[in-house]
């Protein structure tokens, strides 16, 4: 087996993680750009849509622990499986809407109506559910 220099190994690993992060951001950008085009959303430039995608991703990562905590709190109630799934979906949709709304408020060069914010949240909820249904 060939031994690598630790700095080269670290560089290769860093490049892999950077490429993976870029793929995630570009996927978010593509989905949001397509949604904005279909919904007729007004925005100043594609760079603002990219900024929206990055802020949406970061805020989503910040809000996710609170979303998971709220969903986990439903286990303390004696609810049926269907009601639990419904409540979890509602909480996920509301947190995604809160992320889209907060991102819209932070970026002044994109003008989203509340309906468009809910469409963004619903699309990302559907994508999340489709992704979680795939085998690992």
UniProtKB/Swiss-Prot annotation:
GO-annotated cellular components: plasma membrane
Name the UniProt record assigns to this protein: Membrane-bound negative regulator YvrL
Disruption phenotype: Cells lacking this gene exhibit a slight increase in OxdC accumulation under acidic growth conditions and a huge increase under nonstress growth conditions.
Kinase among keywords: no
Natural source organism: Bacillus subtilis (strain 168)
Transmembrane segments: 18-38, 46-66, 83-103, 106-126
Highest taxon of source: Bacteria
Coiled-coil segments: none
Membrane topology per record: Multi-pass membrane protein
Induction line: Expression activated by ComK. Positively regulated by SigO and its coactivator RsoA.
Main location as per UniProt: membrane
Signal sequence annotation: none
């Amino acid at each position: 087996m060939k031994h690598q220099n630790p700095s080269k190994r670290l560089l290769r690993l860093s490049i892999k993680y950077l490429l993976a992060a870029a793929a995630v951001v570009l996927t978010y950008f593509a989905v949001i750009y397509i949604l904005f085009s279909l919904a007729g959303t007004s925005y100043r430039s594609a760079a603002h849509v990219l900024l929206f995608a990055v802020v949406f991703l970061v805020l989503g990562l910040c809000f996710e622990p609170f979303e998971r905590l709220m969903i986990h709190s439903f286990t303390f109630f004696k609810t049926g499986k269907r009601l639990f799934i419904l409540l979890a979906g509602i909480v996920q949709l509301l947190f995604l809407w809160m992320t889209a709304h907060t991102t819209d408020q932070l970026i002044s060069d994109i003008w989203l109506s509340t309906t468009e914010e809910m469409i963004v949240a619903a699309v990302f909820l559907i994508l999340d559910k489709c992704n979680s249904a795939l085998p690992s």
